[in-house]
Amino acid sequence: MGNAATAKKGSEVESVKEFLAKAKEDFLKKWENPAPNNAGLEDFERKKTLGTGSFGRVMLVKHKATEQYYAMKILDKQKVVKLKQIEHTLNEKRILQAVNFPFLVRLEYAFKDNSNLYMVMEYVPGGEMFSHLRRIGRFSEPHARFYAAQIVLTFEYLHSLDLIYRDLKPENLLIDHQGYIQVTDFGFAKRVKGRTWTLCGTPEYLAPEIILSKGYNKAVDWWALGVLIYEMAAGYPPFFADQPIQIYEKIVSGKVRFPSHFSSDLKDLLRNLLQVDLTKRFGNLKNGVSDIKTHKWFATTDWIAIYQRKVEAPFIPKFRGSGDTSNFDDYEEEDIRVSITEKCGKEFCEF
């Protein structure tokens, strides 16, 4: 590297440091003093179900006063309690209302009633990366790299705030109108300074240390990034089997096979991310995220331009208008039932 290039790199590293320090200040203000709830169910017109889960659903809604479309996550308090997800749900709201990054979906409103908790987020009409990946089969390496770069920056941001994401997978990545990623579902995100022990995540994406019930840290997100890049570029995940237990055996074995079309740079990066030995896993070493950002596979990536959303996306989802749902699957519709008496008031008093 010439002196000028070295100086430029140095100033970029400094400006990232400054940016993250300021971001932490902004985050902590909102983390310590969460915004009060600022809407009610009657403010929204419900349009269509976009997805369902074990304790709720996500619906497309229209804000009556502004006519803006949003995605409303509706969680049944009693089901959340039954499934022991109180802590996770409170975490999700508290984190979402405090973060601010170009590739994180924004929480616009939150409120609760006798039966449910509601989180109203910006609506991302392009649908899940998952459905586009399954339709196309696999992404070219430049296409996969464009998405991977956004996740790297997002994890760099989250980790600087002591947040572990813990749920990376193509189903949780939405493609926006400009073809960029919006990370959604902070149900497993957690603020952790040291290690944590909770078993959570998706079998194919779990790091070996989670499976082995060891205390784990942010490095689990870098492992999951390796799984995601592999799945984007191959069309299938690196560890798969019919039963979770068989998947876990493959993950802890530390053996990965690569398709012949993977470039040698890609294989090298993945060997360093899908590294069972934590003392060798990229993202977890003394240089932190810079081992990933300066890796040869990312040589062509302009990190600042990605952050500024100035890079042309390899794919723009098709959709007609802001309330179009054609990129989402159809689900059976169900009425939102609200009890006349308050359920689980104590458990969710801080929501």
UniProtKB/Swiss-Prot annotation:
Catalytic activity: L-seryl-[protein] + ATP = O-phospho-L-seryl-[protein] + ADP + H(+); L-threonyl-[protein] + ATP = O-phospho-L-threonyl-[protein] + ADP + H(+)
Keywords per UniProt: ATP-binding, cAMP, Cell membrane, Cytoplasm, Kinase, Lipoprotein, Membrane, Myristate, Nucleotide-binding, Nucleus, Phosphoprotein, Serine/threonine-protein kinase, Transferase
PTM annotation (Phosphoserine): residues: S11, S140, S322, S339
Binding site for ATP: L50, G51, T52, G53, S54, F55, G56, R57, V58, K73
Summary of the tissues where the protein is detected: Isoform 2 is mainly expressed in heart and brain.
Mod. after translation: Asn-3 is deaminated to Asp in more than 25% of the proteins, giving rise to 2 major isoelectric variants, called CB and CA respectively (0.4 pH unit change). Deamidation proceeds via the so-called beta-aspartyl shift mechanism and yields either 'D-Asp-2' (major) or 'D-isoAsp-2' (minor), in addition to L-isomers. Deamidation occurs after the addition of myristate. The Asn-3 form reaches a significantly larger nuclear/cytoplasmic ratio than the 'Asp-2' form.
Activation/inhibition comment: Activated by cAMP.
All copies of domain AGC-kinase C-terminal, residue ranges: 299-351
Modification Phosphotyrosine, positions: Y69, Y331
Domain Protein kinase residue range list: 44-298
Annotated InterPro entries: AGC-kinase_C, Kinase-like_dom_sf, Prot_kinase_dom, Protein_kinase_ATP_BS, Ser/Thr_kinase_AS, STKc_PKA
GO molecular function: ATP binding; cAMP-dependent protein kinase activity; protein serine kinase activity
Biological process per Gene Ontology, one example term: negative regulation of TORC1 signaling
Keyword Magnesium: no
E.C. number: 2.7.11.11
SMART domains: S_TK_X, S_TKc
Pfam families per the UniProt record, alphabetical: Pkinase
Catalytic residues in the record: D167
Cellular compartments annotated: Cytoplasm; Cell membrane; Membrane; Nucleus
A GO cellular component entry from the record: cytosol
Main subcellular location of this protein, as a coarse class: cytoplasm
Function: Mediates cAMP-dependent signaling triggered by receptor binding to GPCRs. PKA activation regulates diverse cellular processes such as cell proliferation, the cell cycle, differentiation and regulation of microtubule dynamics, chromatin condensation and decondensation, nuclear envelope disassembly and reassembly, as well as regulation of intracellular transport mechanisms and ion flux. Regulates the abundance of compartmentalized pools of its regulatory subunits through phosphorylation of PJA2 which binds and ubiquitinates these subunits, leading to their subsequent proteolysis.
Protein family per UniProt: Belongs to the protein kinase superfamily. AGC Ser/Thr protein kinase family. cAMP subfamily.
Quaternary data: A number of inactive tetrameric holoenzymes are produced by the combination of homo- or heterodimers of the different regulatory subunits associated with two catalytic subunits. cAMP causes the dissociation of the inactive holoenzyme into a dimer of regulatory subunits bound to four cAMP and two free monomeric catalytic subunits. Interacts with PRKAR1A and PRKAR2B. The cAMP-dependent protein kinase catalytic subunit binds PJA2. Interacts with GPKOW.
Protein name in the entry: cAMP-dependent protein kinase catalytic subunit beta
